[in-house]
Amino acid sequence: MEGKNLTSISEFFLLGFSEQLEEQKALFGSFLFMYLVTVAGNLLIILVIITDTQLHTPMYFFLANLSLADACFVSTTVPKMLANIQIQSQAISYSGCLLQLYFFMLFVMLEAFLLAVMAYDRYVAICHPLHYILIMSPGLCVFLVSASWIMNALHSLLHTLLMNSLSFCANHEIPHFFCDIDPLLSLSCTDPFTNELVIFITGGLTGLVCVLCLIISYTNIFSTILKIPSAQGKRKAFSTCGSHLSVVSLFFGTSFCVYFIPPSTRSAQKDTVASVMYTVVTPMLNPFIYSLRNQEIKSSLRKLIWVREIHSP
């Protein structure tokens, strides 16, 4: 292996989905449509929350941050893929690949953290409604969101620096449409034990904390809802967390298929297709889930559209 320390390589090649020109044209159109819908939908949710003072509550503060994370998340991977299809190239620079890895890990973990924080918010709202305003103070909300951003920025930086310390062999082809950590580790010609150990410890710990927060919060939520005597009261209580539960199921369900399925039953093609679900489809569906199942969001959207019609010439 001497003389083959290739950490200074200039680029990787993202194999993506297909090399057939006709299939690439179809993929370009599909992903461009999904990307535009995702960014527009999430930015619209943020705009609605900012402009409607009635939505200036902890729940919608967290939702605005989740929408921002979704818009950034999809912007980390899809634009580069679209650009490569457009210029008929599979190349991504070494620094560009590490930069993509950094932001991908930042936003995927940030999404998990924010969903856990939102579950805690719903727990307090349903299980301790009389103390909700006192517990979910503006200071605590800002702290929870700021801590999520900072912790995940540092967590992503750690993994990116460790990846940069590896040497890569002659094969620079990544069987994926973006620079994910597992495909990159498989290309290393040096022992990635340290990287894998850090992934196991930090990734396992942060993932466990998020999942436990979700499980504990929703266990208490469902327990409280079942104790409500009237059916109308149960429906009203469940409606406050139904949208969030749908998003949680979609995000964690699809990401589970990529990272927790035994390697013996996985393939690069299956992982790539499954990755589309939580990197592209989930961020695209989130605004629709919240707008269709949330009466306050729908009402604010109607008011925003009505105001624009009134002021339009």
From Swiss-Prot:
UniProt main location, coarse: membrane
Keywords of this entry: Cell membrane, Disulfide bond, G-protein coupled receptor, Glycoprotein, Membrane, Olfaction, Receptor, Sensory transduction, Transducer, Transmembrane, Transmembrane helix
Q: Which GO terms describe its cellular component?
A: plasma membrane
The record's Gene Ontology biological-process terms are: G protein-coupled receptor signaling pathway; sensory perception of smell
* SUPFAM superfamilies linked to this entry: Family A G protein-coupled receptor-like (SSF81321)
Q: Give ranges for the Extracellular compartment.
A: 1-25, 80-100, 159-196, 260-272
Residues passing through the membrane, by range: 26-49, 58-79, 101-120, 141-158, 197-219, 237-259, 273-292
Annotated membrane topology is: Multi-pass membrane protein
Gene3D superfamilies for this protein: Rhodopsin 7-helix transmembrane proteins
Q: List the disulfide bonds.
A: 97-189
State the InterPro entries in the record: GPCR_Rhodpsn (IPR000276), GPCR_Rhodpsn_7TM (IPR017452), Olfact_rcpt (IPR000725)
State a single Gene Ontology molecular function.
odorant binding
Cytoplasmic compartment spans: 50-57, 121-140, 220-236, 293-313
Which positions does UniProt annotate with glycan attachment?
5
Protein localization: Cell membrane
A Pfam family cross-referenced in the UniProt record is 7tm_4
* PANTHER family given in the database record: OLFACTORY RECEPTOR
Q: What does this protein do?
A: Odorant receptor.
UniProt record similarity statement? Belongs to the G-protein coupled receptor 1 family.
Q: What is this protein called?
A: Olfactory receptor 1G1
Q: What's the source species for this entry?
A: Gorilla gorilla gorilla
State the taxonomy lineage: Eukaryota, Metazoa, Chordata, Craniata, Vertebrata
Name of encoding gene: OR1G1
